[in-house]
Design a protein with these regions (language model features):
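Conserved AMP-binding/adenylation subdomain of ANL enzymes
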Residues: 7-27, 31-74, 88
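Acidic/polar alpha-helix N-cap and adjacent early helical turns
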Residues: 339-350
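Glycine-centered tight turns that cap/initiate beta-strands
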Residues: 100, 124, 160, 255-258, ...
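Active-site glycine-centered loops adjacent to acidic/histidine catalytic or metal-binding residues
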Residues: 108, 132, 155, 214, ...
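Gly/Ser/Thr-rich phosphate-binding loop
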Residues: 14, 20-22, 46-49, 72-77, ...
Length: 350
């Protein structure tokens, strides 16, 4: 990236995060991660906003105390943290004065619809999902404050940036067609090269588009919808299933804190959907026997089948104490898949 990336970070912090002079702002990202640099430091400072930096471990009560003590008005955090706050219970929120909160945003991975509904219930306002990548250097598609939110959508491209859904040859696709989320190059914060890997850098571009590696679709109103990483999409019984939609359906069940979904090779169906699920603490305490666990698995499979297409439910479910994640909170499906298939795990940092 070049130094002019701060232009995009400044503008999007103003437009999307709605930062104002009088705000007290908290971006919960690690300062060493790209979001920490772009929006905990550069985006907030360039807008003249006071920012909280907290280096401690995640603790729901501690987080609410910080929001209360420092009168935080704009809060930018990760879906994983939101789900953990949901799991901690709503009663904890009532112990603190959070009336100064006016704008909530999320970053790092897709935002499950259930998390948006929860924030409306407990904070009186939705979390606004934002989409971008290390390679893009700044927010590219988002739900900004002036927009009506379609729960589950990534939102729309930020002003000055052109986004589209394209096929593998870089040709634009129609409304509600699954394809690659792509951007027209040359926005200020776009990466300029990959160090010592020029061919890798070139591989990101096709027919005048930057190909993000994420799959999605665009509806008739211009809202973008995330399906999954291109290499995460599951092909089962001749159908394509994005892991995010299955994970979101599972998380909507009251017994589930979070879920990670992979495709597992199957001789009959090509792949089957396997889900790794973290259960609510109260459910774990009441579930001691194998028959009880099997009953919950069956209940979850039927729940997903009821809310999604008949082929999109998990045929295997495994309960976990926690899911492998990056420092930024993204669920590392590739590590879960490597463990499941007995393959080398590789780098566990990103």
């Amino acid at each position: 990236h070049s130094h002019r990336a701060i232009l995009q970070e400044h503008m999007t912090a103003h437009w999307v995060l709605d930062l104002r002079d009088e705000d007290a702002y908290w971006c919960t990202a690690d300062p060493g991660w790209v979001t920490g640099i772009a929006y905990e430091i550069l985006g907030s400072w360039s807008n003249g906003v006071a920012a909280l930096v907290y280096a401690g471990r995640f603790d729901p009560d501690r987080w609410y105390k910080l929001l209360d003590k420092y009168n935080i008005s704009v809060w930018y955090t990760a879906p994983t943290a939101i789900r953990m706050l949901m799991a901690a219970g709503d009663s904890l929120i009532k112990k603190h004065n959070l009336s100064h909160l006016r704008h909530l945003c999320s970053v790092g991975e897709p935002l499950n619809p259930e998390a948006v509904r929860w924030s409306i219930k407990v904070f009186g306002m939705p979390f606004h999902d934002t989409w971008w990548q290390t390679e893009t250097g700044a927010i590219c598609i988002a739900n900004y404050p002036s927009m009506d939110i379609k729960i589950g959508s990534m939102g729309k491209p930020v002003p000055g940036l052109t986004a589209a859904i394209v096929d593998d040859n870089g040709h634009e696709l129609g409304v509600n067609k699954e394809g690659n989320i792509a951007l027209k190059p040359k926005w200020p914060s776009m990466m300029h090269t990959i160090w010592r890997r020029p061919q890798k850098y070139k591989s990101y571009f096709t027919n005048g588009w930057y190909i993000s590696g994420d799959r999605g679709m665009m509806d008739k109103d211009g809202y973008f919808w995330f399906i999954g990483r291109a290499d995460d999409v599951i092909k089962t019984s001749g159908e394509r299933v994005g892991p995010f939609e299955v994970e979101s359906a599972l998380v909507a069940h009251p017994s589930v804190v979070e879920a990670g979904v992979i495709g597992k090779p199957d001789t009959m169906r090509g792949e089957i959907i396997k889900a790794f699920v973290v259960l609510e603490k109260s459910v774990i305490e009441k579930t001691k026997t194998k028959p009880q666990l099997e009953k919950i698995k069956e209940e979850l499979s039927l729940y997903v089948k009821k809310h999604l297409a008949g082929h999109a439910y998990p045929r295997e479910i495994e309960f976990m104490d926690k899911l492998p994640k990056t420092r930024s909170g993204k669920i590392m499906r590739r590590i879960q898949k490597a463990k499941e298939l007995g393959l080398p795990i590789g780098d566990t940092s990103t």
